[in-house]
Protein backbone atom coordinates (compact mmCIF):
# COMPACT_ATOMS: atom_id res chain seq x y z
CA UNK A 1 0.00 0.00 0.00
CA UNK A 2 1.50 3.31 -1.08
CA UNK A 3 1.37 6.36 1.16
CA UNK A 4 3.02 9.78 1.42
CA UNK A 5 4.87 11.24 4.39
CA UNK A 6 4.83 15.01 4.77
CA UNK A 7 8.10 16.89 5.14
CA UNK A 8 7.15 17.86 8.67
CA UNK A 9 6.32 14.29 9.69
CA UNK A 10 9.54 13.07 8.11
CA UNK A 11 11.49 15.65 10.07
CA UNK A 12 9.73 14.69 13.30
CA UNK A 13 10.63 11.08 12.63
CA UNK A 14 14.28 12.01 12.13
CA UNK A 15 14.26 14.09 15.30
CA UNK A 16 12.84 11.14 17.23
CA UNK A 17 15.62 8.92 15.89
CA UNK A 18 18.21 11.52 16.85
CA UNK A 19 16.92 11.92 20.38
CA UNK A 20 16.78 8.15 20.84
CA UNK A 21 20.38 7.88 19.65
CA UNK A 22 21.69 10.67 21.89
CA UNK A 23 23.18 9.29 25.12
CA UNK A 24 21.54 10.29 28.35
CA UNK A 25 24.63 12.32 29.18
CA UNK A 26 24.15 14.47 26.09
CA UNK A 27 23.24 18.10 26.46
CA UNK A 28 19.58 18.78 27.08
CA UNK A 29 20.21 22.05 25.31
CA UNK A 30 20.82 20.23 22.05
CA UNK A 31 17.60 18.25 22.40
CA UNK A 32 15.65 21.43 23.13
CA UNK A 33 17.33 23.13 20.19
CA UNK A 34 16.40 20.28 17.83
CA UNK A 35 12.77 20.35 18.93
CA UNK A 36 12.69 24.11 18.47
CA UNK A 37 14.17 23.77 14.97
CA UNK A 38 11.33 21.46 13.97
CA UNK A 39 8.78 23.98 15.19
CA UNK A 40 10.42 26.86 13.36
CA UNK A 41 11.81 25.36 10.14
CA UNK A 42 9.58 24.35 7.23
CA UNK A 43 12.16 22.29 5.32
CA UNK A 44 13.02 18.72 6.24
CA UNK A 45 16.66 17.68 6.34
CA UNK A 46 18.92 14.86 7.56
CA UNK A 47 19.15 16.31 11.02
CA UNK A 48 21.51 13.66 12.39
CA UNK A 49 24.15 14.76 9.88
CA UNK A 50 23.73 18.45 10.70
CA UNK A 51 24.74 18.30 14.37
CA UNK A 52 28.13 17.62 15.91
CA UNK A 53 28.50 17.30 19.66
CA UNK A 54 31.15 15.76 21.94
CA UNK A 55 28.55 13.49 23.55
CA UNK A 56 27.34 11.98 20.29
CA UNK A 57 30.73 11.45 18.66
CA UNK A 58 33.78 13.15 20.17
CA UNK A 59 35.99 12.31 17.18
CA UNK A 60 33.62 13.77 14.58
CA UNK A 61 33.00 16.80 16.80
CA UNK A 62 36.73 17.48 17.06
CA UNK A 63 37.22 17.04 13.31
CA UNK A 64 34.38 19.42 12.52
CA UNK A 65 35.53 22.02 15.06
CA UNK A 66 39.04 21.99 13.62
CA UNK A 67 38.07 21.59 9.96
CA UNK A 68 38.41 25.21 8.88
CA UNK A 69 40.18 26.81 11.85
CA UNK A 70 43.08 28.87 10.54
CA UNK A 71 44.75 29.80 13.83
CA UNK A 72 45.72 26.66 15.74
CA UNK A 73 46.33 28.80 18.84
CA UNK A 74 42.61 28.53 19.59
CA UNK A 75 42.32 24.75 19.33
CA UNK A 76 44.11 23.84 22.54
CA UNK A 77 42.28 21.77 25.21
CA UNK A 78 42.00 24.83 27.46
CA UNK A 79 40.03 26.88 24.93
CA UNK A 80 36.23 26.89 25.50
CA UNK A 81 34.31 24.54 23.24
CA UNK A 82 30.76 24.92 21.88
CA UNK A 83 27.95 22.78 23.24
CA UNK A 84 27.43 21.64 19.66
CA UNK A 85 27.96 22.67 16.05
CA UNK A 86 24.99 23.06 13.73
CA UNK A 87 25.34 23.05 9.93
CA UNK A 88 22.23 24.48 8.25
CA UNK A 89 21.34 23.15 4.82
CA UNK A 90 18.75 25.80 3.95
CA UNK A 91 18.23 29.45 4.74
CA UNK A 92 15.18 28.61 6.86
CA UNK A 93 17.46 26.57 9.13
CA UNK A 94 19.50 29.69 9.81
CA UNK A 95 16.33 31.61 10.62
CA UNK A 96 15.26 28.85 13.01
CA UNK A 97 18.72 28.69 14.59
CA UNK A 98 18.54 32.38 15.47
CA UNK A 99 15.00 32.07 16.84
CA UNK A 100 15.89 28.99 18.89
CA UNK A 101 19.16 30.36 20.23
CA UNK A 102 17.31 33.44 21.39
CA UNK A 103 14.55 31.37 22.99
CA UNK A 104 16.99 29.05 24.78
CA UNK A 105 19.43 31.85 25.68
CA UNK A 106 22.26 30.28 23.74
CA UNK A 107 25.06 32.46 22.44
CA UNK A 108 25.79 32.07 18.72
CA UNK A 109 29.14 32.08 16.99
CA UNK A 110 28.92 32.30 13.19
CA UNK A 111 31.44 30.56 10.96
CA UNK A 112 31.78 30.62 7.18
CA UNK A 113 35.48 30.07 6.49
CA UNK A 114 36.96 29.92 9.99
CA UNK A 115 39.65 32.50 9.26
CA UNK A 116 39.01 34.92 12.13
CA UNK A 117 42.52 35.69 13.36
CA UNK A 118 41.47 35.61 17.02
CA UNK A 119 39.26 32.54 16.62
CA UNK A 120 36.05 34.46 17.28
CA UNK A 121 34.08 32.36 14.78
CA UNK A 122 34.60 29.20 16.82
CA UNK A 123 35.68 30.22 20.36
CA UNK A 124 33.84 32.32 22.95
CA UNK A 125 35.92 33.12 26.01
CA UNK A 126 33.23 34.99 27.97
CA UNK A 127 29.96 33.55 26.64
CA UNK A 128 28.67 30.18 27.87
CA UNK A 129 26.95 28.14 26.77
CA UNK A 130 27.60 28.87 23.12
CA UNK A 131 27.00 27.06 19.84
CA UNK A 132 28.53 27.39 16.40
CA UNK A 133 26.33 27.87 13.36
CA UNK A 134 28.58 26.69 10.55
CA UNK A 135 27.48 27.99 7.15
CA UNK A 136 29.77 25.81 5.06
CA UNK A 137 26.89 23.84 3.51
CA UNK A 138 25.33 27.06 2.15
CA UNK A 139 27.82 27.46 -0.69
CA UNK A 140 25.88 27.88 -3.92
CA UNK A 141 27.25 30.42 -6.42
CA UNK A 142 25.00 31.59 -9.27
CA UNK A 143 26.73 33.63 -11.98
CA UNK A 144 24.67 35.81 -14.33
CA UNK A 145 26.78 37.29 -17.10
CA UNK A 146 23.84 39.22 -18.55
CA UNK A 147 23.77 41.41 -15.46
CA UNK A 148 27.51 41.15 -14.70
CA UNK A 149 26.68 39.85 -11.25
CA UNK A 150 26.60 36.74 -9.10
CA UNK A 151 24.89 35.58 -5.92
CA UNK A 152 27.38 33.85 -3.64
CA UNK A 153 26.18 32.13 -0.47
CA UNK A 154 28.10 32.72 2.74
CA UNK A 155 29.66 29.25 2.99
CA UNK A 156 31.33 29.45 -0.41
CA UNK A 157 35.04 30.12 -0.36
CA UNK A 158 36.63 32.87 -2.38
CA UNK A 159 38.26 30.15 -4.47
CA UNK A 160 34.88 28.64 -5.29
CA UNK A 161 33.51 32.04 -6.29
CA UNK A 162 36.47 32.62 -8.60
CA UNK A 163 36.08 29.13 -10.09
CA UNK A 164 32.35 29.52 -10.77
CA UNK A 165 32.97 32.85 -12.48
CA UNK A 166 35.65 31.41 -14.77
CA UNK A 167 33.37 28.47 -15.58
CA UNK A 168 31.13 30.98 -17.33
CA UNK A 169 33.68 33.47 -18.63
CA UNK A 170 37.43 33.91 -19.03
CA UNK A 171 37.05 37.69 -19.09
CA UNK A 172 35.15 38.28 -15.86
CA UNK A 173 36.48 38.30 -12.31
CA UNK A 174 35.88 39.66 -8.82
CA UNK A 175 38.24 41.83 -6.75
CA UNK A 176 38.44 39.94 -3.47
CA UNK A 177 40.91 37.99 -1.36
CA UNK A 178 44.30 36.47 -2.07
CA UNK A 179 43.72 33.42 0.15
CA UNK A 180 41.39 31.05 -1.71
CA UNK A 181 40.01 29.31 1.40
CA UNK A 182 38.46 32.47 2.87
CA UNK A 183 34.72 32.15 3.41
CA UNK A 184 33.02 34.90 1.43
CA UNK A 185 30.45 35.48 4.19
CA UNK A 186 32.98 36.81 6.69
CA UNK A 187 35.45 38.10 4.13
CA UNK A 188 33.28 40.77 2.51
CA UNK A 189 31.80 41.94 5.79
CA UNK A 190 35.28 43.15 6.78
CA UNK A 191 36.09 44.91 3.52
CA UNK A 192 37.98 42.27 1.50
CA UNK A 193 41.12 43.46 -0.23
CA UNK A 194 42.81 41.60 -3.05
CA UNK A 195 45.19 41.89 -5.98
CA UNK A 196 42.71 43.93 -8.08
CA UNK A 197 41.93 46.47 -5.34
CA UNK A 198 43.98 49.19 -7.04
CA UNK A 199 41.89 48.74 -10.20
CA UNK A 200 38.41 48.10 -8.80
CA UNK A 201 38.49 48.73 -5.04
CA UNK A 202 37.62 46.25 -2.31
CA UNK A 203 35.29 43.29 -2.58
CA UNK A 204 32.88 45.19 -0.33
CA UNK A 205 32.98 48.15 -2.73
CA UNK A 206 31.56 45.80 -5.36
CA UNK A 207 28.59 44.39 -3.43
CA UNK A 208 25.18 45.10 -4.97
CA UNK A 209 22.83 43.38 -2.52
CA UNK A 210 22.80 40.95 0.37
CA UNK A 211 20.54 38.57 2.25
CA UNK A 212 20.86 38.45 6.02
CA UNK A 213 19.02 37.00 9.00
CA UNK A 214 18.37 39.59 11.69
CA UNK A 215 18.04 39.06 15.44
CA UNK A 216 14.32 38.29 15.03
CA UNK A 217 14.98 35.49 12.56
CA UNK A 218 13.76 37.46 9.54
CA UNK A 219 15.44 37.24 6.14
CA UNK A 220 16.13 40.71 4.77
CA UNK A 221 17.51 41.89 1.45
CA UNK A 222 18.93 45.34 0.77
CA UNK A 223 15.52 46.95 0.36
CA UNK A 224 14.15 45.38 3.53
CA UNK A 225 17.17 46.04 5.76
CA UNK A 226 17.54 49.63 4.60
CA UNK A 227 20.55 51.55 3.34
CA UNK A 228 22.04 52.14 6.80
CA UNK A 229 22.33 48.44 7.59
CA UNK A 230 23.45 47.67 4.04
CA UNK A 231 26.20 50.25 4.54
CA UNK A 232 27.19 48.72 7.89
CA UNK A 233 27.56 45.12 6.71
CA UNK A 234 29.97 46.09 3.91
CA UNK A 235 33.07 46.57 6.04
CA UNK A 236 31.66 46.86 9.57
CA UNK A 237 33.08 43.50 10.64
CA UNK A 238 31.51 40.09 11.12
CA UNK A 239 29.17 38.99 13.87
CA UNK A 240 27.63 42.38 14.72
CA UNK A 241 24.48 42.90 12.66
CA UNK A 242 23.15 39.52 11.59
CA UNK A 243 23.93 36.31 9.77
CA UNK A 244 25.10 36.88 6.21
CA UNK A 245 23.30 34.36 4.00
CA UNK A 246 24.48 35.54 0.60
CA UNK A 247 26.05 38.43 -1.26
CA UNK A 248 25.16 39.75 -4.68
CA UNK A 249 28.47 40.83 -6.16
CA UNK A 250 29.38 42.89 -9.21
CA UNK A 251 31.63 41.14 -11.70
CA UNK A 252 34.49 43.15 -13.19
CA UNK A 253 36.22 42.82 -16.58
CA UNK A 254 39.58 41.05 -16.70
CA UNK A 255 41.82 40.64 -19.75
CA UNK A 256 42.39 37.30 -21.44
CA UNK A 257 46.09 37.62 -20.60
CA UNK A 258 47.33 38.40 -17.09
CA UNK A 259 51.01 38.50 -16.15
CA UNK A 260 52.54 37.50 -12.82
CA UNK A 261 56.04 37.55 -11.39
CA UNK A 262 57.96 37.00 -8.18
CA UNK A 263 61.37 38.64 -7.80
CA UNK A 264 63.29 38.22 -4.55
CA UNK A 265 65.94 40.50 -3.09
CA UNK A 266 68.04 40.03 0.04
CA UNK A 267 69.98 42.48 2.18
CA UNK A 268 73.10 41.50 0.26
CA UNK A 269 71.38 42.48 -3.01
CA UNK A 270 70.58 46.05 -1.89
CA UNK A 271 67.23 44.77 -0.64
CA UNK A 272 66.68 47.67 1.77
CA UNK A 273 67.35 50.25 -0.94
CA UNK A 274 64.95 48.54 -3.36
CA UNK A 275 62.24 48.31 -0.69
CA UNK A 276 62.62 51.99 0.16
CA UNK A 277 62.04 52.78 -3.51
CA UNK A 278 58.95 50.50 -3.56
CA UNK A 279 57.53 52.45 -0.60
CA UNK A 280 57.72 55.63 -2.63
CA UNK A 281 56.13 54.36 -5.85
CA UNK A 282 53.86 51.37 -5.02
CA UNK A 283 50.71 53.49 -4.59
CA UNK A 284 51.46 55.51 -7.74
CA UNK A 285 51.91 52.62 -10.18
CA UNK A 286 49.57 51.88 -13.08
CA UNK A 287 46.17 50.82 -11.68
CA UNK A 288 46.54 47.48 -13.50
CA UNK A 289 49.62 46.60 -11.45
CA UNK A 290 49.62 45.21 -7.92
CA UNK A 291 53.02 44.47 -6.33
CA UNK A 292 53.02 43.21 -2.77
CA UNK A 293 56.15 42.45 -0.74
CA UNK A 294 56.49 39.32 1.39
CA UNK A 295 59.29 39.74 3.93
CA UNK A 296 60.85 37.09 6.17
CA UNK A 297 64.24 35.83 7.38
CA UNK A 298 66.04 33.42 5.07
CA UNK A 299 69.22 31.37 5.26
CA UNK A 300 72.28 32.77 3.50
CA UNK A 301 74.03 29.41 3.59
CA UNK A 302 73.36 25.91 4.86
CA UNK A 303 75.01 26.83 8.16
CA UNK A 304 72.45 27.28 10.96
CA UNK A 305 72.01 30.80 12.26
CA UNK A 306 73.47 32.43 9.16
CA UNK A 307 70.39 34.41 8.15
CA UNK A 308 69.45 37.41 6.09
CA UNK A 309 66.19 39.15 5.20
CA UNK A 310 64.33 38.03 2.07
CA UNK A 311 61.99 40.45 0.29
CA UNK A 312 59.83 38.81 -2.39
CA UNK A 313 58.01 41.13 -4.79
CA UNK A 314 54.94 39.24 -5.96
CA UNK A 315 52.84 40.86 -8.66
CA UNK A 316 49.72 40.55 -10.74
CA UNK A 317 49.38 42.72 -13.85
CA UNK A 318 46.15 42.97 -15.83
CA UNK A 319 47.81 42.80 -19.22
CA UNK A 320 50.62 41.18 -21.16
CA UNK A 321 54.30 41.06 -20.24
CA UNK A 322 55.41 43.57 -22.88
CA UNK A 323 53.25 46.33 -21.43
CA UNK A 324 54.23 45.30 -17.90
CA UNK A 325 57.93 45.64 -18.71
CA UNK A 326 57.30 49.13 -20.08
CA UNK A 327 55.49 50.13 -16.88
CA UNK A 328 58.24 48.67 -14.68
CA UNK A 329 61.07 50.27 -16.64
CA UNK A 330 59.41 53.65 -16.26
CA UNK A 331 58.32 53.37 -12.62
CA UNK A 332 60.43 50.76 -10.82
CA UNK A 333 63.61 49.89 -12.74
CA UNK A 334 65.41 49.24 -9.44
CA UNK A 335 63.73 45.84 -9.20
CA UNK A 336 65.48 44.72 -12.38
CA UNK A 337 62.50 42.87 -13.83
CA UNK A 338 63.23 40.89 -17.00
CA UNK A 339 61.09 39.09 -19.57
CA UNK A 340 62.05 35.69 -18.16
CA UNK A 341 60.75 36.72 -14.72
CA UNK A 342 57.26 37.15 -16.20
CA UNK A 343 54.66 34.47 -16.81
CA UNK A 344 51.53 35.12 -18.85
CA UNK A 345 48.38 33.21 -17.93
CA UNK A 346 44.63 33.47 -17.51
CA UNK A 347 43.12 35.49 -14.68
CA UNK A 348 42.02 32.34 -12.82
CA UNK A 349 45.55 30.91 -12.98
CA UNK A 350 46.94 34.21 -11.71
CA UNK A 351 44.59 33.98 -8.72
CA UNK A 352 45.97 30.52 -8.00
CA UNK A 353 49.55 31.76 -8.39
CA UNK A 354 49.02 34.50 -5.81
CA UNK A 355 47.29 32.02 -3.47
CA UNK A 356 50.31 29.71 -3.49
CA UNK A 357 49.13 26.84 -5.67
CA UNK A 358 51.76 25.07 -7.80
CA UNK A 359 51.71 25.99 -11.50
CA UNK A 360 50.61 22.45 -12.34
CA UNK A 361 47.41 22.73 -10.28
CA UNK A 362 44.14 22.80 -12.23
CA UNK A 363 41.46 25.41 -11.42
CA UNK A 364 39.41 22.64 -9.79
CA UNK A 365 41.90 22.77 -6.89
CA UNK A 366 40.10 25.96 -5.84
CA UNK A 367 37.05 23.87 -4.96
CA UNK A 368 38.87 22.04 -2.16
CA UNK A 369 38.14 24.93 0.17
CA UNK A 370 40.92 24.04 2.59
CA UNK A 371 43.65 26.37 3.78
CA UNK A 372 47.11 25.65 2.41
CA UNK A 373 48.73 27.08 5.53
CA UNK A 374 47.82 26.49 9.18
CA UNK A 375 49.88 27.62 12.14
CA UNK A 376 49.79 28.87 15.67
CA UNK A 377 50.12 32.60 15.13
CA UNK A 378 49.56 36.12 16.36
CA UNK A 379 48.86 38.87 13.85
CA UNK A 380 48.72 42.65 13.85
CA UNK A 381 48.27 45.29 11.17
CA UNK A 382 49.27 48.82 10.29
CA UNK A 383 48.66 51.44 7.62
CA UNK A 384 51.55 53.57 6.40
CA UNK A 385 51.19 57.22 5.36
CA UNK A 386 54.86 58.15 4.80
CA UNK A 387 57.73 55.95 3.58
CA UNK A 388 59.51 54.19 6.43
CA UNK A 389 63.09 55.54 6.38
CA UNK A 390 66.08 53.28 5.80
CA UNK A 391 67.11 53.45 9.45
CA UNK A 392 63.62 52.35 10.44
CA UNK A 393 63.84 49.38 8.08
CA UNK A 394 67.26 48.43 9.43
CA UNK A 395 65.88 48.45 12.97
CA UNK A 396 63.06 46.20 11.79
CA UNK A 397 65.52 43.74 10.24
CA UNK A 398 67.40 43.50 13.54
CA UNK A 399 64.19 42.53 15.29
CA UNK A 400 63.14 40.08 12.57
CA UNK A 401 66.44 38.24 12.83
CA UNK A 402 65.80 37.71 16.55
CA UNK A 403 62.54 35.79 15.90
CA UNK A 404 62.15 32.20 14.65
CA UNK A 405 59.49 32.54 11.93
CA UNK A 406 58.26 36.11 11.57
CA UNK A 407 56.50 37.27 8.44
CA UNK A 408 55.24 40.58 7.18
CA UNK A 409 53.28 41.30 4.02
CA UNK A 410 53.07 44.81 2.58
CA UNK A 411 50.15 45.51 0.23
CA UNK A 412 50.09 48.66 -1.92
CA UNK A 413 47.20 51.10 -1.99
CA UNK A 414 46.53 53.99 -4.36
CA UNK A 415 44.60 53.73 -7.60
CA UNK A 416 40.88 53.19 -7.06
CA UNK A 417 41.46 52.91 -3.31
CA UNK A 418 42.38 56.60 -3.25
CA UNK A 419 39.35 57.64 -5.28
CA UNK A 420 36.68 56.17 -2.99
CA UNK A 421 35.56 58.23 0.00
CA UNK A 422 36.52 56.86 3.42
CA UNK A 423 32.86 57.05 4.46
CA UNK A 424 31.49 55.26 1.38
CA UNK A 425 31.48 52.04 3.43
CA UNK A 426 32.75 51.48 7.01
CA UNK A 427 36.25 50.55 5.75
CA UNK A 428 37.99 53.96 5.97
CA UNK A 429 41.59 53.33 4.88
CA UNK A 430 41.65 55.20 1.58
CA UNK A 431 43.32 58.32 0.19
CA UNK A 432 46.70 59.05 1.75
CA UNK A 433 47.48 55.43 2.56
CA UNK A 434 50.65 54.21 0.84
CA UNK A 435 50.38 50.60 1.90
CA UNK A 436 49.01 48.23 4.52
CA UNK A 437 51.20 45.98 6.65
CA UNK A 438 50.28 42.60 8.07
CA UNK A 439 52.56 41.44 10.90
CA UNK A 440 52.78 37.77 11.84
CA UNK A 441 54.66 35.60 14.26
CA UNK A 442 54.13 31.89 13.62
CA UNK A 443 55.13 28.77 15.50
CA UNK A 444 54.39 25.05 15.55
CA UNK A 445 54.91 23.92 19.14
CA UNK A 446 51.69 25.27 20.61
CA UNK A 447 51.74 26.62 24.16
CA UNK A 448 55.40 25.69 24.66
CA UNK A 449 56.77 28.88 23.10
CA UNK A 450 53.62 30.99 22.76
CA UNK A 451 54.57 33.52 25.42
CA UNK A 452 57.94 34.20 23.79
CA UNK A 453 56.45 34.77 20.34
CA UNK A 454 53.63 36.94 21.66
CA UNK A 455 56.17 39.07 23.52
CA UNK A 456 58.24 39.47 20.36
CA UNK A 457 55.41 40.64 18.11
CA UNK A 458 54.11 43.09 20.71
CA UNK A 459 57.57 44.62 21.17
CA UNK A 460 58.11 44.80 17.41
CA UNK A 461 54.69 46.46 17.03
CA UNK A 462 55.65 48.99 19.69
CA UNK A 463 58.90 49.77 17.84
CA UNK A 464 57.03 50.41 14.58
CA UNK A 465 54.63 52.91 16.15
CA UNK A 466 56.87 55.83 15.16
CA UNK A 467 56.67 54.91 11.45
CA UNK A 468 52.97 54.22 10.84
CA UNK A 469 49.61 56.01 10.93
CA UNK A 470 48.80 58.05 14.03
CA UNK A 471 45.77 59.50 15.82
CA UNK A 472 44.54 56.85 15.53
CA UNK A 473 47.06 54.15 14.73
CA UNK A 474 44.90 52.33 12.19
CA UNK A 475 44.22 48.59 11.87
CA UNK A 476 42.35 46.27 9.51
CA UNK A 477 39.32 44.58 11.08
CA UNK A 478 39.80 41.36 9.09
CA UNK A 479 43.19 41.05 10.80
CA UNK A 480 41.42 40.92 14.13
CA UNK A 481 43.64 41.93 17.07
CA UNK A 482 42.22 41.67 20.59
CA UNK A 483 45.28 43.48 21.97
CA UNK A 484 43.59 46.67 20.75
CA UNK A 485 40.74 46.20 23.25
CA UNK A 486 37.52 44.28 23.80
CA UNK A 487 33.96 45.01 24.79
CA UNK A 488 34.55 43.47 28.22
CA UNK A 489 37.98 45.01 28.69
CA UNK A 490 39.16 48.27 30.21
CA UNK A 491 39.84 49.96 26.87
CA UNK A 492 37.03 52.25 25.72
CA UNK A 493 35.40 50.82 22.59
CA UNK A 494 35.94 54.17 20.89
CA UNK A 495 39.69 53.58 21.01
CA UNK A 496 39.79 50.26 19.18
CA UNK A 497 36.74 51.20 17.11
CA UNK A 498 38.54 54.26 15.74
CA UNK A 499 41.54 52.12 14.79
CA UNK A 500 39.39 49.88 12.61
CA UNK A 501 36.81 52.38 11.35
CA UNK A 502 38.05 55.92 12.10
CA UNK A 503 35.12 58.36 11.96
CA UNK A 504 32.72 55.65 10.78
CA UNK A 505 32.62 53.94 14.17
CA UNK A 506 30.00 56.22 15.72
CA UNK A 507 27.67 55.65 12.76
CA UNK A 508 28.15 51.89 13.12
CA UNK A 509 27.24 52.09 16.82
CA UNK A 510 24.11 54.10 16.06
CA UNK A 511 22.98 51.58 13.42
CA UNK A 512 23.73 48.67 15.74
CA UNK A 513 21.69 50.22 18.54
CA UNK A 514 18.68 50.64 16.27
CA UNK A 515 18.93 47.34 14.37
CA UNK A 516 19.99 44.96 17.16
CA UNK A 517 19.18 46.85 20.38
CA UNK A 518 19.42 43.72 22.56
CA UNK A 519 22.93 43.02 21.26
CA UNK A 520 22.02 39.46 20.25
CA UNK A 521 24.84 39.32 17.72
CA UNK A 522 27.97 39.99 19.71
CA UNK A 523 31.52 38.90 20.41
CA UNK A 524 34.62 40.28 22.10
CA UNK A 525 35.08 42.99 19.46
CA UNK A 526 31.64 43.37 17.91
CA UNK A 527 30.16 46.81 17.34
CA UNK A 528 28.46 47.79 20.64
CA UNK A 529 24.93 49.18 20.88
CA UNK A 530 26.19 52.32 22.60
CA UNK A 531 29.41 53.96 23.76
CA UNK A 532 30.23 56.20 26.66
From Swiss-Prot:
Its cofactor is FAD. It is an enzyme of class 1 (oxidoreductase). One of its GO terms (cellular component) is extracellular region. It is found in: Secreted, Cell wall. It catalyses: (E)-4-coumaroyl alcohol + A = (E)-4-coumaraldehyde + AH2; (E)-coniferol + A = (E)-coniferaldehyde + AH2; (E)-sinapyl alcohol + A = (E)-sinapaldehyde + AH2; 4-O-(beta-D-glucosyl)-(E)-coniferol + A = 4-O-(beta-D-glucosyl)-4-(E)-coniferyl aldehyde + AH2. Belongs to the oxygen-dependent FAD-linked oxidoreductase family. This is Monolignol oxidoreductase AtBBE-like 15. It comes from Arabidopsis thaliana (Mouse-ear cress). The gene is MEE23.
Amino acid sequence: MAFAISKRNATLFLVTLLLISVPLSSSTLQQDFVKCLVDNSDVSFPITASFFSPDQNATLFKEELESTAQNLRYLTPSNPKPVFIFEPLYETHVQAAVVCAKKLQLHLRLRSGGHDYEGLSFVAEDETPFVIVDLSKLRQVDVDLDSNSAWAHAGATIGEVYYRIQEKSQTHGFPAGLCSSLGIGGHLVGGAYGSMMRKFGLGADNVLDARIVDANGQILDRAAMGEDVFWAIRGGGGGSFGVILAWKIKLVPVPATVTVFTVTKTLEQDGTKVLYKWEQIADKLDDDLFIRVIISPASKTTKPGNRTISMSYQAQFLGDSNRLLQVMQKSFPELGLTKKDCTEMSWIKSVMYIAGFPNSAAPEALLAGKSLFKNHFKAKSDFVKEPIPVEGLEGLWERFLEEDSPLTIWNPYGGMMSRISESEIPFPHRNGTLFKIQWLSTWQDGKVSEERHMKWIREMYSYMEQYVSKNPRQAYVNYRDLDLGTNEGETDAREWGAKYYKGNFERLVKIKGEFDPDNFFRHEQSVPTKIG
